[in-house]
C-alpha cells in the first residue's frame, strides 16, 4: 500500500513497551483509536519507514488488562495489545520511524527503532 492510501489520524494513541533484539526483533505494545468504541476488533499493523525503505508488519493481538484498568470507562480496549516478530534478515539495517496502523488509519508514534 502507498502511504497515501492510509488516513492520517490524530485519534490514535499508544506505545511500544518492549523491544527485544536477538535473532528476531520482537516488539510489544498497545494502541487504540480514542474516537472509536471498536478497539478490540481493530486490525493493527506497524509500518517501519525511513528515506529508503518501508515495511508493513502484521501484529498478533494481545490481552492488555493494564490498559483496560487505566481506562475503566473503555470496555473496548482489553485486547488493544500487540506483539510482532521480525526476522532481522527480512529488513535492511537502518533507523526507522514507526507508524501505528489501526484499520486503515495511520499515526506516527514518535518512536524510532534501529535495526
Predicted segments with their positions:
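Basic, ligand-binding patches in group-transfer machinery
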Residues: 1-115
Amino acid at each position: 500500500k502507498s502511504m497515501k492510501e492510509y488516513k492520517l489520524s490524530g485519534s490514535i494513541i499508544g506505545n511500544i513497551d518492549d523491544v527485544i533484539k536477538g535473532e528476531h526483533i520482537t516488539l510489544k505494545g498497545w494502541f487504540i483509536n480514542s474516537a472509536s468504541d471498536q478497539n478490540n476488533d481493530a486490525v493493527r499493523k506497524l509500518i517501519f519507514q525511513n528515506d529508503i525503505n518501508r515495511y508493513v508488519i502484521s501484529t498478533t493481538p494481545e490481552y492488555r488488562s493494564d490498559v483496560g484498568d487505566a481506562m475503566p470507562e473503555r470496555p473496548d480496549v482489553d485486547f488493544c495489545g500487540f506483539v510482532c516478530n521480525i526476522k532481522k534478515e527480512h529488513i535492511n539495517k537502518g533507523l526507522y520511524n514507526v507508524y501505528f496502523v489501526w484499520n486503515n488509519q495511520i499515526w506516527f508514534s514518535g518512536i524510532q527503532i534501529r535495526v
